[in-house]
Amino acid sequence: MIMSTCAANCIPLLIQQSVDGTYSFNRSWAEFKVGFNDSRGNYWLGNDLLHQLTNGARYKLQCVLQRTSRVFYVANYNIFLVGSESSNYTLSVGRYRGGAVGPGDAMAIHDGMMFSTYDRDNDLSSGNCAQQHGGGFWHNNCYSAGMTVMKDQGDGFVWKTLSYGTLQRATLLLTC
């Protein structure tokens, strides 16, 4: 197990990045377990490592959402914890904190959800959200924060509390 302490001056750690919605996050349980990336910057850290990091320290989650080259939204959560594989990497997120132009709380419905992929369906939907929308995530029924959804699978990156349109880029960061 990786034990870590969170210093006040820690550097944010990239958990996930979807550069433009054309990269497929429709990956297997085994791939999400260890993580993956490509040369353009699309990235998933890996669920095992997320569990190891967050199990030993108190971390926060920062979601950076880019609508256009000049329009960004930031959503912060005061707790981010990922359970072990035996719990299906159950997600715990704390209270939402947004800025003056915050995007709103789209992660709340994902709190307490198990991770789902096309080959391991743990969501609350009668279907398979990861398979339907083209990406593994802590789906509920199905998502409010569609951080791994491909543009050709419907909405593209979505943060449902934003009033209109899709996002160009979505990034999740582990912060202190």
Identify the meaning behind each predicted range.
Residues M1-C176:
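Mature extracellular or lumenal effector domains of secreted proteins
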